[in-house]
Amino acid sequence: MLHAVSNVTRAVLLSGAAIAGLVPPSSAADGKAETYLAVWASDKETDDHHLDPDFLAIIDADPRSPTYGKVVNTAALESVPNANLLDELGLASGVASDVLNEAHHMNHDPITVYGRQYLFPAGLMSANIFRCDVTDPLHIPTCPLVTTSTQVKKFAGIDDIVQLPNNHLLVTYLGAKDLTTPGGLVEIDVEGNVVHEYDAAQAGGPTRYMPSVRGVTDTGLLAHPHGMDFRPDLGVVVTSDYADPSSIATNTAPWNPDQDLGTTVRVWDVSHLDAGPQKIVQVPAGASIEPNRVQNAPEGLMEVGLTHLHRHKGAFTASMQGGTLFYSPDITAPSPVFREVYDVGPGAGASLFIVTADDWYLILPVAGILSPGDPNYDRDYQGEHSRRLVALDIQRLLAAGPRIECDAPRVVMGPDGFTKKILGHNNGAPDCPVEAGSLNLDSEGNFASHGGPHFIAVDHESRRIAAANYFVQLTPFGLPGTMSGGDDRVCMAWLTPAGELIRDERFKDELTGQPCVALDRPTSYLWPNRGRTGAAKPHMLAFINLPDETGSEERGDDQ
C-alpha cells in the first residue's frame, strides 16, 4: 500500500523539464546504491532447453549510482524435493521446490519484521511461497520455502498478497486444489504457517450478466480471487474474480472463447473473514456485445484497487480480456454499484494498475494482447492494442462522490446484433478520467508473444514506475498457457506532477545499451550469484529502499 505524500512534496516532484536536474550524475556518498528493484522471475527453458531454478533478481534502481540498471545480485530459492503442487496432484514426481513455480506474485513492498525486510515470492503453478530477506539486497541468503501446497487443503493457484494489521499475510488463491473452481483466501503468518483458509464461494450471488462458459448463472459460486486490496480504516478487503485456472492453462489462443472468466468483485469484512464475502458485485456489461463473449467488458477482472485518502471510499477494478476500467464511489455501501469509466478496448489487456498515494492518478498497464492480424486488432481506434502505460487523472471522478455522470461509451451495432465499433473510452462526461500521459512499450517481442506490460511497481519516494513485460506462459509444463507472454523486459518511467509518463532512458540494459533491462539474457551471460542459465521471465517487481539513516521521512496528512 502506498503512503500519502504532502502537497509540499508533490510540488517539488519531477516535471519533464526538471528530471535531469533532479537526478545527480554522481553516486551516493558511500558509493552504494540506496534503491534496488527486486524482480521475481522464472527460468525460460525454451532458450537452452534446460530447466534452471527460479530466482529473485536484484537490479540497481538508484539513478545516482554508476551501476544503475545493472543486475547486481540474484537470490536462490530453497530446493526441497517433491515440494510442488504437481507432485501433490500426481502429475509429476520428484519436482523440487525451486523449479516449475511459474514466478507470479509477491507482496508489493517489503515487510519489516524485527528490523529485517522480507519479500514473499509465490508460485502460480507450484503453490509454493518463499521468504526472502532483502534487508541487504546485495547479500540475500537462500530464500527458505515457508508454505507448500500440502499445507493449504482447499486451494491452489497463488496470486495477490497483502499484509494485515496483525502482520499476517492474506493471499488470494485463484482456484480449487485441482486448479478448477472455486478459489479462496488463505491467511499465513510471517513464518509461513497457515492460520486459516477462507471460502470465497457463496451460493446466492447476483445473476451473471450472461451464463458462464459452463452454464453457471450464480456468480456467488464463480469465485476466482485474483486481485486484492485492503483499507484498514474502512475495515474491508476487496477481491476481484479473474478466471477458472484450468480454462486458461489449456488456452490455445489469446482470444479463446472457452476461457471461463470472472465478472464479480467480492467485499470482505477484515474482522470476520471466516464469514466469507459480505457483498458480491456483478460489474456492468455495458452496451457493447462482442462476437467473442470473453471480450465483453466485464470479462476477466484481473485487478482491484482502492483509493487511499480517508475522504475517499472508492474502488476500481479492471478486466483483462474485456479491457475495461470500472469504478464504484463507495465500496462500504450496502450495495456498491460499479460504472464503466474507461474502455481501452476488447482484448486489450487492462492489467495490474495502481492508484497513486495522493489519489490523483491511476496508472494502467495495457498489455495489448491482440497483435496485427488477430480478430478485432485496433478495430475501434489506431493504437487500441498498443502495449503501453496510461496515466489517468481521476480527480474529477473522485470529487463527484456518488453523483457520477461518467459511464460506458456509445457503440455501433451491426445487423448481426454484435458490436461493430466502440465510440470512445467513455461517454465523455465532465467527471470521466482524463488521459494525462502514456508511454508506448511496443516491441517485436511483445507483438510476437501477444504480451506487454502486465505488472507495475511504484517507488513512492521518487514517483518512478517500473513495468514488467510478461504475463504467463506455461510451455515448461507442456501446456499452452494463456498464450500471452511478453518480451521479458523491465522498463522504468518517471511520473511527473502533470501526469506525464517519461521513459527513463538511463535505465538501460547493461549488455545492449538499449532502454529497459532485458531478462532474455544470452546463455553466455554470467548472472551474479547464479551462473550461466540464459533467459528468464520477469513477472512481479518491488522497490527496495534502504532505510534513511537520519530516521526522517516526510508523510502527508491523509485527509
Describe these PLM feature segments.
Residues 134-232, 241-252, 263, 291:
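Asp-box/WD-like beta-propeller blade repeats and closely related beta-sheet repeat scaffolds
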Residues 40-99, 111-114, 120-145, 221-401, 407:
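Beta-propeller domains
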Residues 58-67, 131-141, 189-195, 256, ...:
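Short loop/turn segments immediately following beta-strands, especially the blade-tip
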Residues 70-101, 144-154, 196-223, 277-302, ...:
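Surface-exposed loop and turn segments in beta-propeller and other repeat-based domains
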Residues 456, 462-559:
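Blade-level signature of beta-propeller repeat domains, shared across WD40, Kelch, NHL, RCC1
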Residues 36-51, 172-183, 239-262, 364-385, ...:
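Short, conserved, GDST-rich strand-edge loop motifs in beta-rich repeat architectures
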Residues 29-33, 88-115, 157-166, 218-235, ...:
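Structural signature of eukaryotic scaffold interfaces centered on beta-propeller domains
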